[in-house]
Amino acid sequence: MAGKLVVVKVGTGSLVKSDGSLNLESMRRLVDQIAKAVKEGNKIILVTSGAIAAGIAELKVKPNPNDIVFKQACAAAGQSILMSYYREFFKAHGLKVAQVLLTERDLSDRISYLHTCNVLDRLLQLGVIPIINENDVTSINEIIPVMKGQKINFSDNDILSVLIANATEADLVVILTTVDGLYTKSPEKPGASLIPVVEKITPEIRRAAEGKSRFGRGGMKTKIQAAEIAMQSGIPLIIANSNRENVLLDILDGKHVGTLFKPYGRKLPSIKKWIAYGAGTKGQIKVNEGAKKAILRGASLLAVGIEGVSGRFQIG
């Protein structure tokens, strides 16, 4: 699979040791694989967690999951440390990196969204590896993992990785975690089996995804939410175990690894993907059955088909 644009997301659990400190060997192995993939002609965008964990280790403090400002302070201390290791490891392969910190507002505002797209595209043209993380210092959407009204949270960067894939027209999203993929039930329970391919997000799939990861905030549930967005956007997504040797290279070589979420339908145009998943919801329009059918056919919505409006929003 050469010449492809791939978004690789690695979660906190894959980057830290059992004591919560950064696992530099795991980071180095991931960088080695990305470097090889790039030299084979692929373009890689890395979406990484781990800033808070790095900050906790640097400041020599105990984790306090209920103190939001504490987590933000740790992220501020840890982000530069996280990047310094990535820069060092990629430099060994002759590759340069660029830090990109984003918030939900950056992707929900159309102008900021387009600027982000342009910068990422230019970095890739320059042969630079964009390394993306949510800006935990100014945004709490990620560190408070709940659905906020009708907006989608980044949820430990799972959702963010797919939004970035949409923004850059990526060919594939790979989410690396601490399990082999999606199981029929918790992999710690007897009788659990790996689900190799998912073609539709069913209630059974959602039930199989219940539970959270030890260090991360998202867990499998938000990975399924991310996968559903990718599938609807026409982008395949794979969940795989970061601890598997050469996991990323095997995926790019076409080997079946982890759980593949197949896209369905045609690939959405960029503007429709942004409207569907990037723009924050400001209100609702209730339409009649005729208008619904017209919209599903791709036709325009006429005023006669509107039955009700709620919320405050502007044209466009």
Residue ranges and their predicted role:
Residues 1-96, 100-315:
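C-terminal catalytic "cap/lid" subdomain
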